[in-house]
Protein backbone atom coordinates (compact mmCIF):
# COMPACT_ATOMS: atom_id res chain seq x y z
CA UNK A 1 0.00 0.00 0.00
CA UNK A 2 1.35 3.41 -0.97
CA UNK A 3 1.42 6.27 1.45
CA UNK A 4 0.21 9.69 0.53
CA UNK A 5 3.71 11.09 0.45
CA UNK A 6 4.97 8.51 -2.05
CA UNK A 7 2.12 8.82 -4.57
CA UNK A 8 3.02 10.40 -7.90
CA UNK A 9 1.59 13.89 -8.36
CA UNK A 10 0.74 15.87 -11.47
CA UNK A 11 1.51 19.18 -9.81
CA UNK A 12 4.66 21.06 -10.50
CA UNK A 13 6.98 21.10 -7.59
CA UNK A 14 7.69 24.81 -7.79
CA UNK A 15 4.97 27.32 -8.59
CA UNK A 16 5.91 30.05 -10.99
CA UNK A 17 3.59 33.03 -11.15
CA UNK A 18 3.10 34.44 -14.64
CA UNK A 19 4.30 38.00 -15.11
CA UNK A 20 1.54 40.55 -15.37
CA UNK A 21 1.70 43.40 -17.78
CA UNK A 22 1.85 46.79 -16.08
CA UNK A 23 -1.57 48.37 -15.66
CA UNK A 24 -2.44 51.25 -17.91
CA UNK A 25 -5.24 53.64 -17.00
CA UNK A 26 -7.97 53.40 -19.62
CA UNK A 27 -10.28 56.38 -19.80
CA UNK A 28 -13.48 55.96 -21.78
CA UNK A 29 -15.02 59.16 -23.00
CA UNK A 30 -18.44 59.54 -24.54
CA UNK A 31 -18.64 61.27 -27.89
CA UNK A 32 -21.38 63.54 -26.56
CA UNK A 33 -21.84 64.85 -23.04
CA UNK A 34 -25.26 63.58 -21.88
CA UNK A 35 -26.04 66.62 -19.73
CA UNK A 36 -25.39 68.98 -22.62
CA UNK A 37 -27.45 66.94 -25.08
CA UNK A 38 -30.49 66.56 -22.78
CA UNK A 39 -30.39 70.19 -21.61
CA UNK A 40 -29.90 71.50 -25.13
CA UNK A 41 -32.70 69.49 -26.67
CA UNK A 42 -35.08 70.36 -23.82
CA UNK A 43 -34.27 74.07 -24.11
CA UNK A 44 -34.70 73.92 -27.88
CA UNK A 45 -38.10 72.22 -27.62
CA UNK A 46 -39.29 74.65 -24.95
CA UNK A 47 -38.29 77.57 -27.16
CA UNK A 48 -39.97 76.01 -30.21
CA UNK A 49 -43.12 75.33 -28.20
CA UNK A 50 -43.25 78.85 -26.78
CA UNK A 51 -42.28 80.94 -29.79
CA UNK A 52 -43.35 78.81 -32.77
CA UNK A 53 -46.23 76.47 -31.98
CA UNK A 54 -48.05 78.26 -29.14
CA UNK A 55 -50.20 80.33 -31.50
CA UNK A 56 -51.23 77.22 -33.41
CA UNK A 57 -52.09 75.40 -30.17
CA UNK A 58 -54.20 78.28 -28.87
CA UNK A 59 -55.99 78.72 -32.20
CA UNK A 60 -56.98 75.03 -32.18
CA UNK A 61 -58.13 75.28 -28.54
CA UNK A 62 -60.29 78.32 -29.34
CA UNK A 63 -61.80 76.50 -32.32
CA UNK A 64 -62.68 73.50 -30.14
CA UNK A 65 -64.21 75.74 -27.47
CA UNK A 66 -66.61 77.40 -29.92
CA UNK A 67 -67.63 74.15 -31.58
CA UNK A 68 -68.07 72.08 -28.41
CA UNK A 69 -71.41 71.07 -26.89
CA UNK A 70 -73.45 73.67 -25.02
CA UNK A 71 -75.03 73.26 -21.59
CA UNK A 72 -76.56 76.53 -20.43
CA UNK A 73 -75.45 78.76 -23.24
CA UNK A 74 -71.79 78.34 -22.32
CA UNK A 75 -69.53 75.61 -23.61
CA UNK A 76 -67.90 73.04 -21.37
CA UNK A 77 -64.58 74.72 -22.11
CA UNK A 78 -65.88 78.04 -20.73
CA UNK A 79 -67.11 76.33 -17.57
CA UNK A 80 -63.73 74.68 -17.05
CA UNK A 81 -61.90 77.97 -17.59
CA UNK A 82 -63.82 79.59 -14.72
CA UNK A 83 -62.48 77.04 -12.24
CA UNK A 84 -58.93 76.66 -13.51
CA UNK A 85 -56.71 78.91 -11.40
CA UNK A 86 -53.82 76.44 -11.32
CA UNK A 87 -53.05 77.15 -14.97
CA UNK A 88 -52.81 80.91 -14.47
CA UNK A 89 -49.51 82.33 -15.67
CA UNK A 90 -47.76 85.68 -15.95
CA UNK A 91 -46.43 84.83 -19.40
CA UNK A 92 -47.86 87.30 -21.94
CA UNK A 93 -48.60 84.53 -24.42
CA UNK A 94 -50.05 82.18 -21.79
CA UNK A 95 -47.34 79.47 -21.80
CA UNK A 96 -48.37 77.46 -18.71
CA UNK A 97 -47.14 74.48 -16.69
CA UNK A 98 -48.87 71.98 -18.98
CA UNK A 99 -47.02 73.40 -21.98
CA UNK A 100 -43.71 73.26 -20.09
CA UNK A 101 -44.30 69.63 -19.10
CA UNK A 102 -45.33 68.59 -22.61
CA UNK A 103 -42.57 70.35 -24.54
CA UNK A 104 -40.00 69.41 -21.89
CA UNK A 105 -40.95 65.74 -22.19
CA UNK A 106 -40.58 65.91 -25.97
CA UNK A 107 -37.18 67.56 -25.56
CA UNK A 108 -36.03 64.84 -23.17
CA UNK A 109 -37.24 62.09 -25.51
CA UNK A 110 -35.40 63.57 -28.49
CA UNK A 111 -32.26 64.05 -26.38
CA UNK A 112 -32.26 60.42 -25.27
CA UNK A 113 -32.88 59.31 -28.85
CA UNK A 114 -29.85 61.32 -29.98
CA UNK A 115 -27.71 59.70 -27.28
CA UNK A 116 -28.98 56.22 -28.17
CA UNK A 117 -28.30 56.67 -31.87
CA UNK A 118 -24.87 58.10 -31.12
CA UNK A 119 -23.99 55.10 -28.94
CA UNK A 120 -24.69 52.76 -31.88
CA UNK A 121 -21.86 54.22 -33.95
CA UNK A 122 -19.09 51.68 -34.26
CA UNK A 123 -21.19 48.87 -32.80
CA UNK A 124 -21.25 45.63 -34.75
CA UNK A 125 -24.96 44.82 -35.00
CA UNK A 126 -24.81 42.06 -37.60
UniProtKB/Swiss-Prot annotation:
First and last residues of the transit peptide: 1-30
Protein's cellular compartments: Plastid, Chloroplast thylakoid membrane
Tagged with keyword Membrane: yes
UniProt topology in membrane: Multi-pass membrane protein
Major subcellular site: plastid
GO cellular component: chloroplast thylakoid membrane; photosystem I
Domain of life: Eukaryota
BP GO terms, sorted: photosynthesis
Keywords recorded for this protein, A-Z: Chloroplast, Membrane, Photosynthesis, Photosystem I, Plastid, Thylakoid, Transit peptide, Transmembrane, Transmembrane helix
Transmembrane segments: 36-56, 97-117
InterPro entries assigned to the protein according to its UniProt record, in alphabetical order: PSI_PsaG, PSI_PsaG/PsaK, PSI_PsaG/PsaK_dom, PSI_PsaG/PsaK_pln
Matching Pfam families: PSI_PSAK (PF01241)
NCBIfam families per record: PS_I_psaG_plant (TIGR03051)
Family: Belongs to the PsaG/PsaK family.
Function: Not yet known.
Protein name: Photosystem I reaction center subunit V, chloroplastic
Native organism: Chlamydomonas reinhardtii
Lineage: Eukaryota, Viridiplantae, Chlorophyta, core chlorophytes, Chlorophyceae
